[in-house]
């Protein structure tokens, strides 16, 4: 018999039903559960898959560069970044005839094209690329790296080049290499690129391989570095009248601390960013020499952790046993990595709009909105994944003997207190926030808006004032001209920073009021509830009051019947599943808030947000309904415009989203009957019956139906909002 899918599980491969396909897909990446798996093969498989991941990333970025160079308008855009619309790629076959061809022919193109809302034009422009040839060169280089990664992945699966388990578990060496090599050297290399290529390009000088060794990035060369006069590199910065990309108003400084934004591009000063990356490089190069390896210098991580013991009393045994627990559990390590990456991704979303790094991106409103939303959603999925793998760690890898009375064991011991406190916080936030919104709704409905309960966010305003925002009149720290903080920074970065924070045209420390106070607490409710579900799922993964032997059932089990007092929705997988809905819900509120606040800021009618955001009807009517009107008219009986593709995606997103409910709510047996009916008809239809269906259709399991439902719900939800966001923003601002 030929080998059937899945080859990694012979038991499953012999299943005669459609379960074979479903369970095969579900466990394809669960290397630990595969036939004949050893610890060594497990680590080697994961290591090899990292190379594949890198190859895909390089191929994808290469494709972006290639298509823009081939079908885009980069060279035209560079001449006038504020008025030329950047083209992502051509549309081969625009449907709906001539009106569609005309609607999608824009950005100076000869035929129908898609506009780029990813910010790649601004990014490439800022780092010194100027011609299509530059883009092609980059695409080829990344293609080469992609091929190299694939070869690397293949090579490390060959017997001679397979790393051993001891190599994977050498935490000190890995940390040193990642800190020094990955972060330190790459930050230093990036500083080099900014100083040698990007900063000259911003001053109208074209540095490439042919003149790279002849052009001094600074008039004094390396002199100041060797004589210790580093301050010379900061002298003569670009002036406030500097025209980006030209020598007009440019200086010679390469490492500065100007603060604030370049007046024309509204982005951070390139010389400030070079300085920042140099500082990061030095920090990480030093950090990468902290841990003891073959050379016998530096710290042992195990010794560090074992030393973390509370001085006495009832505080337990601190970090004892943690080193081996973490070092021997891939799920623990993945959980930590995902938690960190999730937070960083969310910070990227926040900082990309408030402190834009790329020239002119702040004036490209649709791109700003798209990038913020994109990074927040990705952060949400990554963060929920951290808790999922934390739960799997507790089920598969946690050893109570190794962790007796340490911080991990104590988390499990007082999980009831943790969960009940989170529950209380969520209930408090939910009832109070909804209560305020509903009260305000009723007051508006009765025609007495003055009876709304409007709370000024005075603590947040005080924090903004401490950072230098003067409009609230708090006169504290940086907003006070007499304090030591003000005097310390007055001669360097402070004037630029204060100028930026008090100018109302950018997104740095936006003015906040009662509407912000309310939506802030709605978001806090979402964050706390999501966290509650995830934390409870992980802490209860090994066992709970109703089901003390839960760990014997694995990570994802559907139901253990009514005999235990009802154990549906009780596996760690169920907690992850429920949390994803809350995560999407929360990020929905976050992105609604960000988008509406910014639309009113960009249109110059902030009072609309301030007045309408204090009650629910305001959000429904003045944000969602008002901003979807253009989108819904992308095409209608009278014709179509360039928003039609978003109008279609908006409808399609709703369809996918609604399909999710068929799997989430419906009786699952219906699917078995449906598929069997389709299979029956298929087998009795000429031509179609040449292809026989070998597997007997069976109903989806509870867990499978939930997964399929969740996937459709998530994808549909994000598709719908993406279309709404891009159409409503680009429809207003072009």
Swiss-Prot record:
Residue positions annotated to bind phylloquinone are 671
Topology in the lipid bilayer is annotated as:
Multi-pass membrane protein
Q: Which terms under GO biological process does the entry name?
A: photosynthesis
Q: What class of enzyme is it?
A: oxidoreductase
The catalytic activity of this protein is classed by the Enzyme Commission as 1.97.1.12
Q: Name one GO cellular component term.
A: chloroplast thylakoid membrane
Q: Which reaction does it catalyse?
A: reduced [plastocyanin] + hnu + oxidized [2Fe-2S]-[ferredoxin] = oxidized [plastocyanin] + reduced [2Fe-2S]-[ferredoxin]
Assigned keywords, A-Z: 4Fe-4S, Chlorophyll, Chloroplast, Chromophore, Electron transport, Iron, Iron-sulfur, Magnesium, Membrane, Metal-binding, Oxidoreductase, Photosynthesis, Photosystem I, Plastid, Thylakoid, Transmembrane, Transmembrane helix, Transport
Q: What is its main location?
A: plastid
**Keyword Electron transport attached:** yes
Quote the record's cofactor note. Answer: P700 is a chlorophyll a/chlorophyll a' dimer, A0 is one or more chlorophyll a, A1 is one or both phylloquinones and FX is a shared 4Fe-4S iron-sulfur center.
- Subcellular compartments: Plastid, Chloroplast thylakoid membrane
Q: Where are the transmembrane segments?
A: 46-69, 135-158, 175-199, 273-291, 330-353, 369-395, 417-439, 517-535, 575-596, 643-665, 707-727
List residues binding chlorophyll a B3. Answer: 662, 670
Give me the residues that bind chlorophyll a B1, please: 654
Binding positions ([4Fe-4S] cluster)? 559, 568
In terms of SUPFAM superfamilies, this protein maps to: Photosystem I subunits PsaA/PsaB
The role this protein plays is: PsaA and PsaB bind P700, the primary electron donor of photosystem I (PSI), as well as the electron acceptors A0, A1 and FX. PSI is a plastocyanin-ferredoxin oxidoreductase, converting photonic excitation into a charge separation, which transfers an electron from the donor P700 chlorophyll pair to the spectroscopically characterized acceptors A0, A1, FX, FA and FB in turn. Oxidized P700 is reduced on the lumenal side of the thylakoid membrane by plastocyanin.
Question: Subunit info?
Answer: The PsaA/B heterodimer binds the P700 chlorophyll special pair and subsequent electron acceptors. PSI consists of a core antenna complex that captures photons, and an electron transfer chain that converts photonic excitation into a charge separation. The eukaryotic PSI reaction center is composed of at least 11 subunits.
User: Which NCBIfam families does the protein's record reference?
Assistant: psaB
Q: What is this protein called?
A: Photosystem I P700 chlorophyll a apoprotein A2
What species was this sequence derived from?
A: Arabidopsis thaliana
